[in-house]
Amino acid sequence: MAFRLVLASQSPRRRELLDQLGVAHEVRPANTDESVHPGEPARAYVLRVAREKARAVEGELVLAADTAVVLRGEVLGKPRDAEDARRMLAALSGTAHEVLTGVCVRRRPGRGSAVELDAVVSTAVRFAPLGPAEISWYVATGEPLDKAGAYAIQGVGGAFVLGVEGSVSNVVGLPLAETAELLRRAGHPLPWDAPGGPAQGGGAP
């Protein structure tokens, strides 16, 4: 039996990515503290926050995620303000960095015990060198202000990305392949699992 999926996020990017999967869902944003604990490793941080988001929302099947940009061990979340966004972009300029997303699927059928399935996905991103004028212009667009690491690969910020190694959807905010696998393991069928779904192989009849 498939449960109605609840997305514990207000991110429009995650909603759009779930729509790409063809997975019906409703949105119930989680209100959790996303601060990094002192000395907390980046992988532990994104996984902890994803789990806390999943636990903060009611539902029989809840999906939550948290994304962070990591540069030389520093976790870059969403910038506090425009000045913080400029600082992040200047630090990322001309470097390679890591994007981590923690994903948690929490299933709690009826009054039964909850089961959590989770994963952390890593993508390497190479950034172009950016001058002060480019950074100021980009920050003035407003795009960086609600994005981890102060850029959006699916937006104007994609012009600054020289290369990506790994999942691109992970950089946007939700790694699709890994999320699909977690949903399947939680007992939630995917559109192509259903009888009469897309044919396997893709060959001509």
Curated annotation (Swiss-Prot):
It comes from the Bacteria. PANTHER family: BIFUNCTIONAL DTTP/UTP PYROPHOSPHATASE/METHYLTRANSFERASE PROTEIN-RELATED (PTHR43213), BIFUNCTIONAL DTTP_UTP PYROPHOSPHATASE_METHYLTRANSFERASE PROTEIN-RELATED (PTHR43213:SF5). NCBIfam families: maf. Nucleoside triphosphate pyrophosphatase that hydrolyzes dTTP and UTP. May have a dual role in cell division arrest and in preventing the incorporation of modified nucleotides into cellular nucleic acids. It is an enzyme of class 3 (hydrolase). Gene3D superfamilies: 3.90.950.10. The record marks 13, 67, 154 as: Important for substrate specificity. The keyword Iron-sulfur does not apply. The active site is at residue 66. Its cofactor is a divalent metal cation. It is found in: Cytoplasm. One of its GO terms (biological process) is nucleotide metabolic process. Belongs to the Maf family. YhdE subfamily. Its main location: cytoplasm. Its EC number is 3.6.1.9. One of its GO terms (cellular component) is cytoplasm. This is dTTP/UTP pyrophosphatase. Keywords: Cytoplasm, Hydrolase, Nucleotide metabolism. It catalyses: dTTP + H2O = dTMP + diphosphate + H(+); UTP + H2O = UMP + diphosphate + H(+). Transmembrane segments: none annotated.
